[in-house]
């Protein structure tokens, strides 16, 4: 439950960072591109919230999924999140593979009206596989469309993750 609250808080904070920044006059938003990954950071005199993110874009330009990593102050290691549309089969794991090698299967942590989320603290080996890889393949099951497989570029991930770690 604590991970779910933290995950939602971080996701919501970064999604609404512009609004948050406007309410904190000293807030500074930093965004840096690392090929297919982006480093975003909202810093104020009170706190700093940073993430790296990549989006899976549909043919019509919409966002199908978003993958992100955050380093949290609790010292428990990086928080990995996947946000996908609702109407996914919550009983089916999200399968991930890197360069055609199975990597991990993650269950959903929670859903809200906008999306369903995976929120995990992956092992170092998971992150190292992403750093060495070129392409991440994600498979999930929609209750409407069946299995959906999407490819996610890992170009720039290593540099973006290094930036996130500081």
Task: Describe the predicted segments one by one.
Residues 1-5:
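Positively charged n-region of N-terminal signal peptides that target proteins for export
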Residues 7-18:
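Bacterial N-terminal signal peptides
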Residues 21-166:
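A generic "folded-domain core" signal
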């Amino acid at each position: 439950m604590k991970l779910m609250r933290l995950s939602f808080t971080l996701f919501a904070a970064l999604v609404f960072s512009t609004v948050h920044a406007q309410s904190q006059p000293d807030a500074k938003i930093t965004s840096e591109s690392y090929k297919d990954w982006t480093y975003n950071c909202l810093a104020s005199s009170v706190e700093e919230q940073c993430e790296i993110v990549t989006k899976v874009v549909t043919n019509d330009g919409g966002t199908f999924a978003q993958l992100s990593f955050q380093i949290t102050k609790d010292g428990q290691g990086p928080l990995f999140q996947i946000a996908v549309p609702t109407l996914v089969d919550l009983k089916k794991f999200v399968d991930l593979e890197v360069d055609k090698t199975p990597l991990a299967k993650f269950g959903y942590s929670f859903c809200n009206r906008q999306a369903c989320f995976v929120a995990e603290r992956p092992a170092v080996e998971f992150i190292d596989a992403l750093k060495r890889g070129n392409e991440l393949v994600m498979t999930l099951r929609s209750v409407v469309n069946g299995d959906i497989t999407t490819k996610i570029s890992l170009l720039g991930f290593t540099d973006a993750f290094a930036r996130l770690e500081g």
